[in-house]
Amino acid sequence: MITPAEEQFSARHAYVPEHLPGYGRAFSGGEAFLVGDYLGYLREGTLIFVGYPLEETYNEKKMKALLAEAMRRFQPFRVALMAPSYSEPGGERKAVDYYYRLDLRSSRIPSKIKNMIHRAGRELRVEKSREFDAEHQKLIDDFLGSREVEEGTRVIFQKIADYLSSVPAAMVFDARDSQGRLAGFDVADFGSEEYAFYLFNFRSRKFPVPGTSDLLLQALIQEARNQRKFYVNLGLGTNEGVAFFKRKWGGMSFLQHEIILLSPRRPSFLNSIFRGMFSA
């Protein structure tokens, strides 16, 4: 559904991870497509529409017009829209969140974080690779078993191995102790021209080392600099603890993120879409 040239175009201009076709295919199980300046994924009657334009400035009215075009083309039973904003009433709406971004051209590591990195570095070493094995899966399973996690998030975590095996630009950063035990790992994607993407972070609950996540993120940032990226998309805030970690590194919220689940086969939904498209 998407040509090699379109896939390269999308990845080159990606500033949210869903813009990366390899990432989107791996975690949605769908086929990527482009409509205008927007990327989407289609799987078994479900359309996932990434409402962030690849090149243009976001315009909700234009986004809704292209969403309507995609719905006419594919006739989905369900639509999951992610966008900076969506003013139409109706649909099942998830909590509003924000993407955080670190500007590598101006960022400096705060002294408190340097201390944590130094502390963790006395016990751990960081290795980068594309390997994902039972040790990594065990940390994911431990995380899922230790707290309540939405089913969608659980499914995504279980697809990380498939994602890594299918996307050459994806990389794993491991933190290991002197005995070779895995204390934590990060997963990142470097497929965009300007952005690196900090996607997943897991730590060992069995032998936690203070500063593990800071040590790993430092290594990821250094790799992004080595690859001449301008930014690291640190991902969504998710909760206050996660958002605090990103802010302490200098991450700034730069994009609002909403998820709206829609039922396009309902006449009332289609009427509202078309009214919004042609209103002043």
What are the language-model segments listed below?
Residues 23-82:
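N-terminal accessory interaction module
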Residues 2-44, 84-209, 218:
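A conserved beta-strand-loop-helix scaffold within acyl/acetyltransferase catalytic domains
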Residues 72-84, 225-235:
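Conserved GNAT acetyl-CoA-binding A-motif
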Residues 69-70, 163, 219-223:
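A generic secondary-structure signal
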Residues 82, 129-131, 235, 256:
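Conserved beta-strand termini and adjacent loop/short-helix elements that scaffold enzyme active sites
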Residues 70-71, 120, 224, 246:
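Generic structural signal for hydrophobic
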Residues 1-19, 260-280:
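Membrane-proximal basic amphipathic "stem/tether" segments
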Residues 169-270:
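Aromatic (often tryptophan-rich) hydrophobic motifs at membrane interfaces
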